[in-house]
């Protein structure tokens, strides 16, 4: 059973990487049968319980520091894992996992992380196109820097379990993404 956690800034187009992985064989997780628990539900519950800020609102990298998660949450994850025992390759993507990377890393030593980043100019262009006129460009850039610094720090501390993907490079050479995951 291989488990992949995809994490990337909301502007990184991480969903396209997730879609590609599903096309080549990664399954979505089976939700727990009793409570319909999904990885996204677990992350949303953790965000609510630990009162994490909205990912796009963070401009100080310290706000992306790892949240120390209580063991009381382990049973939810165990239920999710048990419902995916027969799932050979499964995974999901969620930008809010940035707060809980250490939690997922420690709860299951076999989880692999795919970390997706994009050039900040693309994030800024998307922000300008989708935001009101009062957009603070500095906040958008600071948010991108803070998020991707946490992503890079985690990658550097856990290279044996992580693949770092530049979205532009991925677009031009998708097939090579599966080599580091083998």
What annotation goes with each model-predicted range?
Residues 1-73:
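PAPS-dependent sulfotransferase catalytic core
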Residues 51-55, 78-182:
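PAPS-dependent sulfotransferase catalytic domain
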């Amino acid at each position: 059973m291989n488990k992949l956690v995809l994490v990337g800034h909301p502007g990184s187009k991480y969903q396209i990487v997730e879609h590609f992985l599903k096309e080549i064989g990664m399954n979505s997780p089976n939700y727990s049968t009793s409570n319909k628990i999904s990885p996204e539900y677990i992350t949303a519950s953790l965000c609510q319980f630990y009162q994490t800020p909205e990912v796009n609102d963070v401009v100080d990298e310290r706000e992306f520091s790892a949240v120390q998660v209580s063991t009381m949450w382990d049973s939810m994850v165990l239920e999710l894992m048990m419902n995916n025992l027969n799932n050979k390759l499964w995974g999901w993507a969620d930008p809010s996992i940035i707060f809980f990377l250490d939690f997922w890393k420690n709860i299951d030593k076999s989880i692999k992380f795919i970390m997706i980043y994009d050039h900040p100019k693309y994030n800024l262009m998307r922000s300008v196109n989708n935001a009101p006129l009062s957009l603070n460009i500095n906040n958008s850039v600071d948010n991108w820097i803070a998020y991707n610094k946490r992503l890079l720090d985690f990658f550097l501390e856990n290279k044996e379990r992580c693949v770092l993907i530049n979205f532009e490079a991925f677009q031009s050479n998708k097939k090579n993404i599966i080599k580091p995951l083998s």
